[in-house]
């Protein structure tokens, strides 16, 4: 391993479920640093014991982050090497540590991030949703009004949207997505990533809700919600004749069947017609 610099903070990702996912470099750093700043001592000890690593752990969580950051800066100024870890995944993503890193930059203390696990990116990679542009929104608010306000503000967000959600609120959150964004918007639920009961399921929001309700075990564990971005209908208009045809058919047939027949009669793109009419029917 390369020589450590003097006074360095290492950002060390840890596995999000499968302990085999930890990197060799992460293990080397955890062995060789002077201090490991952990979000949860007991949780991190389980990881260290699994890999036969013994080191000095101190607690840094959201409750003591400000005070502990000051203490750690003093240690770093003395030339100590410190590893920052969270309960799982890459630190700072919904975890404490940002204050410490900011202070490191202020005092010109080197910060070295290690690449590694992140539930949001892991889920996104397997979602099948176009992901060249995406926004990460963290955990959905626990209060319904705040959650609905946020979802409504993202109704026409063209980028793929990523949320974390708990098993306790997943059903209510999917209902709010249907209400505030679109019942027909494609979403993916990625559950228990890298763990034994990992599952990834994608469908329209309304179908996702039905799928979850079919089996209570489908909404157990930690969830990542991925929402397809809003698709704008650019310069797409329909003639009165086409709309009249659709309106007549809609009185007798389902939305899908009415769209299909109308598209065949007028030789137009059924997908564009479908997107157009569902917006009108909302």
Swiss-Prot record:
InterPro entries according to UniProt: 4pyrrol_Mease, 4pyrrol_Methylase_sf, 4pyrrole_Mease_sub1, 4pyrrole_Mease_sub2, rRNA_ssu_MeTfrase_I, SAM_MeTrfase_RsmI_CS
Reaction equation(s) it catalyzes: cytidine(1402) in 16S rRNA + S-adenosyl-L-methionine = 2'-O-methylcytidine(1402) in 16S rRNA + S-adenosyl-L-homocysteine + H(+)
SUPFAM superfamilies per UniProt: Tetrapyrrole methylase (SSF53790)
- Please provide, alphabetically and separated by semicolons, the GO molecular function terms listed in this UniProt record: rRNA (cytosine-2'-O-)-methyltransferase activity
Keyword Cell inner membrane assigned: no
Per the record, the major location class is: cytoplasm
What are the record keywords, sorted? Answer: Cytoplasm, Methyltransferase, rRNA processing, S-adenosyl-L-methionine, Transferase
Q: Where in the cell is it found?
A: Cytoplasm
Pfam families per UniProt: TP_methylase (PF00590)
Q: Which domain of life is it from?
A: Bacteria
Q: What's this protein's family per the entry? A: Belongs to the methyltransferase superfamily. RsmI family.
Please explain the role this protein plays, according to its UniProt record: Catalyzes the 2'-O-methylation of the ribose of cytidine 1402 (C1402) in 16S rRNA.
Q: Would you tell me the protein name for this molecule?
A: Ribosomal RNA small subunit methyltransferase I
